[in-house]
UniProtKB/Swiss-Prot annotation:
Domain of life: Eukaryota
BP terms from Gene Ontology: regulation of DNA-templated transcription
Record-level GO cellular component terms: nucleus
Protein function: May be involved in transcriptional regulation.
Family note: Belongs to the krueppel C2H2-type zinc-finger protein family.
Keyword annotations from UniProtKB, A to Z: DNA-binding, Metal-binding, Nucleus, Repeat, Transcription, Transcription regulation, Zinc, Zinc-finger
Zinc finger (C2H2-type): 173-195, 201-223, 229-251, 257-279, 285-307, 313-335, 341-363, 369-391, 397-419, 425-447, 453-475, 481-503, 509-531
A Pfam family this chain is assigned to: KRAB
Main location: nucleus
Subcellular location(s) of the protein: Nucleus
Name of this protein: Zinc finger protein 737
GO molecular function: DNA-binding transcription factor activity, RNA polymerase II-specific; RNA polymerase II cis-regulatory region sequence-specific DNA binding; zinc ion binding
Length: 536
């Protein structure tokens, strides 16, 4: 009899038999076959990976392949299963029968069965291989041992104790580098790649390398777009089984992972692990390029792209590339119009979660961002940043055409239209055109009579928020616009602008009739009456 091969321990099912198995039994079969293969590899028996194993590793049904492709050589189809009931023990028993039948096929001269001892330890006389079925297996080359808990095959092993270590919890294989222990030497070998940085499994599509073949298999789905794991609840599909498992918690609402420090609960163990770093302040993930440390490996991975400049995630719609997949996902909503983040208060939907978070402040009335200079509070940090420019006089937005600077980017955008003369926003009611959409929106309220901005102090309403803001200063007495030349303060910015012309002598409003200049548009309007003879 030749050496034991994978085909000697492979079990195949007919289509009818496979459909009679429930999920747990199929998982048991998958685990048994994969474990058998790993044990044979560990003992140096299997040279090339059988297609059946590749199939099982990828989560495919064994029946999707031709039988001769699965195990390299024709194998015996198991027919020892009852059609109505397929208990775990039946799979074990069938496995034993198939294995023994394999050896019987090699000839009875090399395979003899004898009754006798109850266990390997009791056998002092025969000193031969014990197969776990109360029988001795006499052969010059091989010994088969059957594990009490699961169906496993060990070849050319002096005893089955090394396999049983898995069930005892012992971890005899220790990493010299970091001290971590394992119950299998093969697992230790795989672990060592973390320290050596070895990445032998390379993607033929993009060249990316991985420590483990399973990671490469998973990675390939990025290129193929394959999503084999489907949620039975909502139909959503995932590229990884772990993603599906994590997703299912959304439907159950379960949060089994609780922080002992603060009691906060999480849906995923990884989220709890990440959360714990808040209490410890630990930043274990360090960038080799710049030395910056991070709490999460995912943040480090994202950070590294800054140094490489790589943008691997490309939009198929417009070709725009991004550094992170999450940014690409968000970008795609521009094309699809999808708004997945909905406000429970008013039903308004948003493309971005950050926009929803910002929007919610409207309902709460919360103004957490306070100006240290004047005490004014704002809903959003961006509004506070913009407001501070009133005090600092900063004007970061400069016009390339004429050099005029502005506090707000929107003001610069509006200003640029002066140079183009363009007025793209037209009122459908009266035909009047405007440089800015916001001005058109405000203008339309003249026709509708809408005044949505109401003063809480006196009840007066306005058609624009800027008018309400200016009005409120009557009650507060606030004069935030101060002249740097003379120190005089004003309630409105346009009054300050007009005042400054006293110091500069500027007269921008010119009469087309006689060429005379004026500081204010109202003064020019009054002057024009001289030419028209109109009585105001």
């Amino acid at each position: 009899m030749g050496p034991l091969q994978f085909r000697d321990v492979a079990i195949e099912f007919s289509l009818e038999e496979w459909h009679c198995l429930d999920t747990a039994q199929r998982n048991l079969y998958r685990n048994v076959m994969l474990e058998n293969y790993r044990n044979l590899v560990f003992l140096g028996i299997v040279v090339s990976k059988p297609d059946l194993i590749t199939c099982l590793e990828q989560g495919k049904k064994p029946l999707t392949m031709k039988k001769h492709e699965m195990v390299a050589n024709p194998s015996v189809t198991c027919s020892h299963f009852a059609r109505d009931l397929w208990p775990e023990q039946s799979i074990k028993d069938s496995f034993q029968k198939v294995t023994l039948r394999r050896y019987e096929n090699y000839g009875h001269d090399n395979l003899q069965f004898k009754k006798g001892c109850e266990s390997v330890d009791e056998c002092k006389v025969h000193k031969r291989g014990y197969n776990g079925l109360n029988q001795y297996l006499t052969t010059t080359q091989s010994k088969i041992f059957q594990c009490d808990k699961y169906v496993k095959v060990i070849h050319k092993f002096s005893n089955s104790n090394r396999h049983k270590i898995r069930h005892t919890g012992k971890k005899p294989f220790k990493c010299i580098e970091c001290g971590k222990a394992f119950n299998q030497s093969s697992t230790l070998t795989t672990h060592k790649k973390i320290h050596t940085g070895e990445k032998p499994f390379k993607c033929e599509e993009c060249g990316k390398a991985f420590n483990w073949s399973s990671h490469l298999t998973t990675h390939k789905r990025i290129h193929t777009g394959e999503k084999r794991y489907k949620c039975e609840d909502c139909g959503k599909a995932f590229s990884r089984f772990s993603y599906l498992t994590a997703h299912k918690i959304i439907h159950s609402g379960e949060k089994p992972y609780k922080c002992e420090e603060c009691g906060k609960a999480f849906k995923r163990s990884s989220n709890l692990t990440t959360h714990k770093i808040i209490h410890t302040g630990e930043k274990p993930y360090k960038c080799e390029e710049c030395g910056k440390a991070f709490k999460r490996s995912s943040i480090l991975t994202a950070h590294k792209i800054i140094h490489s400049g790589e943008k691997p995630y490309k939009c198929e719609e417009c070709g725009k590339a991004f550094k992170h997949p999450s940014v690409l996902t968000t970008h795609k909503r521009i094309h699809t119009g999808e708004k997945p983040y909905k406000c429970e208060e008013c039903g308004r939907a948003f493309k971005y979660f950050s926009s929803l978070t910002t929007h919610k402040i409207i309902h709460s009335g919360e103004k957490p961002y306070k100006c240290e200079e004047c005490g004014k509070a704002f809903n959003w940090s961006s509004h506070l940043t913009t407001h501070k420019r009133i005090h600092t006089g900063e004007k970061p937005y400069k016009c390339e055409e004429c050099g005029e600077a502005f506090k707000y980017s929107s003001s610069l955008t509006t200003h640029k239209i002066i140079h183009t003369g363009q007025q793209p926003f037209k009122c459908e009611e009266c035909g009047k055109a405007f440089k800015c959409f916001s001005i058109l929106t405000t203008h339309k309220r003249i026709h509708t009579g809408e005044k949505p901005y109401k003063c809480e102090e006196c009840g007066k309403a306005f058609n624009s928020s800027s008018h309400l803001t200016a009005h409120k200063r009557i009650h507060t007495g606030e004069k935030p616009y101060k002249c740097e030349r003379c120190g005089k303060a004003f309630k409105r910015s346009f009054i300050l602008t007009r005042h400054k012309r006293i110091h500069t002598g500027e007269k921008p409003y010119k009469c087309e009739e006689c060429g005379k200049g004026f500081k204010c548009p109202s003064t020019l309007t009054t002057h024009k009456v001289i030419h028209t003879g109109e009585k105001l």
